[in-house]
């Protein structure tokens, strides 16, 4: 890490002493991704992301970009139809004004030293410098900072009609029996698919056919 980033000493000490909290790796990975992007620019893509197509050139050229919640809440019928995954509750896909977890932090595009990514890095470093409680860390600190920055004039423009719902469509249907028509519909809505860890994978399920067997 020292070869690529000039972190303050307290960050390296927190890693060594595991005082980022119980989820040390998760919390540090948030700081790591925004620090790498602020320093070098590029694309942060978690291992849980599956790309079924190339990342569009006009998206890669953005100063800053992250997928986030659609501004308009889908109908209850649509939510019931698509949110079938056992990994989600209706509470996660929330449109309340005071709800602060609305970004997909597993895929971020940024130019080096862009205002948005630099602000995320600087605030996170300041937060961890002052945070002494090693037990009750809030899991979505990065997401909360993201929403607060938007309230203070930092902008993140959407891409076409894609939101974090479209990015999760394959995960919603992951355990269903493979349906080529459904897979085509999902690909028409999103080139990027946020997945998760699967303890078991049913043969010929959506996730088996697409990820394991490699069907296009």
Language-model features, listed with the residues they occupy:
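Small-residue hinge/turn detector
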Residues: 30-42
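Glycosyltransferase-associated regions of secretory-pathway enzymes
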Residues: 1-29, 47-216
């Amino acid at each position: 890490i020292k070869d690529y980033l000039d972190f303050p000493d307290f960050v390296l000490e927190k890693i060594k002493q595991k005082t980022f909290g119980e989820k040390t790796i998760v919390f540090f990975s948030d700081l790591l991704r925004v620090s790498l992007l602020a320093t070098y620019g590029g694309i942060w893509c978690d291992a849980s992301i599956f790309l079924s197509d190339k990342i569009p050139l006009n998206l890669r050229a953005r100063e800053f970009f992250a997928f986030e919640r659609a501004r308009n809440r889908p109908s209850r019928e649509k939510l019931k139809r698509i949110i079938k995954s056992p990994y989600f509750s209706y509470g996660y896909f929330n449109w309340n004004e005071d709800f602060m977890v609305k970004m997909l932090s597993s895929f971020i595009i940024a130019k080096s030293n862009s205002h948005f990514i630099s602000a995320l890095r600087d605030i996170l470093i300041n937060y961890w410098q002052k945070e002494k409680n090693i037990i009750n860390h809030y899991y979505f600190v990065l997401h909360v900072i993201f929403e607060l920055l938007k309230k203070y004039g930092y902008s993140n423009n959407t891409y076409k009609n894609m939101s974090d719902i479209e990015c999760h469509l394959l995960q919603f249907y992951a355990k269903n029996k493979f349906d080529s028509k459904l897979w085509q519909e999902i690909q028409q809505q999103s080139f990027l698919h946020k997945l998760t860890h699967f303890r078991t994978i049913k043969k010929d399920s959506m996730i088996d056919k697409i990820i394991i067997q490699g069907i296009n």
